[in-house]
Curated annotation (Swiss-Prot):
EC number: 3.1.3.16
Protein name: Probable protein phosphatase 2C 32
Enzyme class label: hydrolase
The organism of origin for this protein: Oryza sativa subsp. japonica
Residue span, PPM-type phosphatase domain: 129-386
Alphabetical GO biological process terms: abscisic acid-activated signaling pathway
Localization annotation: Membrane
Alphabetic keyword roster: Hydrolase, Magnesium, Manganese, Membrane, Metal-binding, Protein phosphatase, Transmembrane, Transmembrane helix
Transmembrane segments: 95-115
């Protein structure tokens, strides 16, 4: 018969003398935070007479020989923190955003200064038959003057042939600049081919000039485009053409007569033409736009919209008689703020005096009127004295 004897002081039957107490964090602390504290009185070794004394001694020696792992920084902080305290997460280091250096600021200032000091920001040009005044707009987004003009008297060496134009660039100045530099040359070449031809041949020559100018600009693979309005005077005849929303207005005995119609996406016939070509016109923020992008429906350039924004001009031909006083060519910066008849009324008292200073004053006054009414666009105006080119 076996017999079991319980020894009260033996660790085999005695509960551990090393209780753990788990204290919940305070109500204000994070629910994820728990404070653990150990009541760690040193565990007494078995008494010398205990039969477990040799085993306890060997276990004690093994604990001393095994190095304890180094606690992490967070664990060390937890151990060093008072019992019952709540550990807080450390705030991350502040994010420092670098400020542009002096070189970058200086470069930006130099770029602005270059734009502001560009001599094309305000241009005056006059002759015996014409006056030109151009001014850069003051819109917030306006970076550089995008308008250009041309005034060529004695085109191709003929004193009775003259060519004038206003070119309103968009998406940069490159297209308008190219047109102003090259269209007069292309026009002279085309007019040589129809020397002595009738009005129909002349209109076809002007159309070929526009198409060639567009073709040559597209070869450069540059962005942007330009609206155009031109006037060709020869042998007592006037040929006015446009592609875009630059406009030509004739003063006929003091009555305004528009010789062009603006090519805008809002025009019903232009919208129908674009849709027949597979495009679309949409009203975006109150303005009708081709493919939701461009407000004009014709012009030079605009390669990404070339399928719909064509360079074919509309052309009007008429004879210069005694009632034809002067012709105003201007970009939409003027016409958006000044009506046709109003422009004639402002310019006529000054222009019919046949004085250079008065003609330039007429151009300036038209620009000032538009600016006073809120125009922030570039404005270019050419006024031509037509009687100088009558038969």
């Amino acid at each position: 018969m076996s017999c079991t004897v319980a020894i009260p002081s033996s660790p085999v039957f005695s509960p551990s003398r090393r209780p753990l107490s788990c204290k919940a964090a305070s109500a204000s602390a994070s629910p994820e935070s728990v404070s653990v504290a150990a009541s760690s009185p040193a565990q007494a070794a078995p008494p010398a007479g205990s039969p477990l004394r040799p085993f306890a001694l060997r276990a004690h020696l093994r604990e001393e020989a095994t190095p304890s792992p180094q606690p992490s920084a967070a664990a060390a902080a937890a151990v060093s923190a008072p019992a019952g305290s709540v550990l807080k997460r450390r705030r991350p280091a502040p994010l420092v955003v670098p400020v542009c250096g002096g070189a970058a600021a200086a470069a930006a200032a130099a770029a602005v200064a270059a734009v502001e000091s560009d001599p094309r920001n305000e241009v005056e040009e006059d002759g015996e038959e014409f006056a030109v005044y151009c001014r850069r707009g003051k819109g917030r987004r306006r970076v550089e003057m995008e308008d250009r003009h041309v005034a060529k008297v004695a085109l191709g060496g003929d004193p009775k042939v003259a060519f004038f134009g206003v070119f309103d660039g968009h998406g940069g100045k490159s297209a308008a600049e190219f047109v102003a530099e090259n269209m007069p040359k292309f026009m002279a070449e085309e007019m040589c081919k129809v020397d002595g031809g009738d009005s129909g041949e002349t209109e076809q020559a002007v159309k070929r000039c526009y198409l060639k100018t567009d073709e040559e600009f597209l070869k450069r693979e540059e962005s942007g485009g330009a609206c155009c309005v031109t006037a060709l005077l020869q042998k007592g005849g006037l040929v006015v053409s446009n592609a875009g929303d630059c406009r030509a207005v004739l003063s006929r005995a003091g009555k305004a007569e528009a010789l062009t119609s603006d090519h805008r996406a809002s025009r019903e016939d232009e919208r129908e033409r674009i849709e027949n070509l597979g495009g679309f016109v949409v009203n975006y923020r109150g303005t009708w736009r081709v493919q939701g992008s461009l407000a004009v429906s014709r012009g030079i350039g605009d390669a990404h919209l070339k399928q719909w924004v064509v360079s074919d001009p509309d052309t009007t031909t008429l004879g210069v008689d005694s009632q034809c006083e002067f012709l105003i060519l201007a970009s939409d910066g003027l016409w958006d703020k000044v009506e046709n008849q109003e422009a004639v009324d402002i310019a006529r008292p000054l222009y019919i005096s046949n004085d250079k200073a008065s003609r330039m004053t007429a151009c300036r006054r038209l620009v000032e009127t538009a600016v006073t009414r809120g125009s922030t666009d570039d404005i270019s105006i050419v006024i031509i004295q037509l009687q100088q080119f009558s038969r």
